[in-house]
């Protein structure tokens, strides 16, 4: 007799993951650990995490093994027209769509909320940006060290070290990724919102 082990509370939830580096992949890693069916979209070159950290096999670094676990990978180059139809079919069957692309680039790729919600009106759209979707900083890059500096964390850390320094961890990305995963889970309840925007600057 075989006993089927439950996959977790998010079993049956399909997540389309168009994220990269740390923040987004950490968020969707948590969703996968909760049992969600996470489909990770990668470019033909592969996600940057495939080349981050030690690796015994090319493209299978420690970064990929950690943040890519409990996920299925598919290659789409959304800059070419041929990828659009299969991408839209995926969206039409999804419960959650997550990305961490700046607003202007997201609009160019036609993955903004207005476009995605037309394909699946009840989809939970989670956009993790550095400084929000509007305002003077909306399209500025938001790597972890920039957010640590802009939020004052580097200055606070300097009170201990004697001069401003970055916390020795990708603190902003991990904190925001954790918050975003929690917000997505809350949004899966019918009474919650379906359009989530989480600027990293407010999470640290």
Show which residues each predicted segment covers.
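N-terminal helix-loop segment corresponding to the beta1-alpha1 unit
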Residues: 1-190, 195
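Single conserved hydrophobic/aromatic residue that forms the stacking wall/gate
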Residues: 195-204
């Amino acid at each position: 007799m075989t006993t089927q082990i439950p996959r977790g509370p998010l079993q049956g939830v399909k997540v389309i993951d168009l994220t990269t580096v740390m923040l987004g992949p950490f968020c969707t890693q948590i969703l996968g650990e909760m049992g969600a069916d996470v489909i990770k979209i990668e470019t033909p070159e592969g996600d940057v995490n495939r080349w981050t950290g030690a690796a015994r096999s090319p493209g299978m670094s420690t970064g990929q093994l950690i943040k890519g676990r409990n996920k299925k990978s598919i290659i789409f180059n959304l800059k070419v027209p041929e990828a659009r139809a299969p991408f839209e079919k995926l969206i039409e069957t999804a419960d959650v769509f997550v990305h961490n692309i700046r607003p202007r680039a997201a609009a160019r790729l036609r993955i903004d909320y207005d476009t995605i919600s037309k394909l699946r009106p009840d989809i939970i759209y989670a956009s993790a940006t550095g400084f929000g979707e509007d305002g003077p900083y909306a399209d500025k890059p938001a790597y972890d060290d920039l957010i640590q500096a802009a939020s004052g964390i580097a200055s606070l850390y300097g009170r201990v070290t004697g001069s401003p320094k970055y916390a020795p961890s990708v603190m902003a990305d991990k904190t925001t990724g954790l918050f975003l995963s929690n917000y997505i889970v809350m949004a899966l309840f019918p009474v919650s919102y379906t359009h989530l925007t989480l600027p990293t600057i407010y999470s640290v």
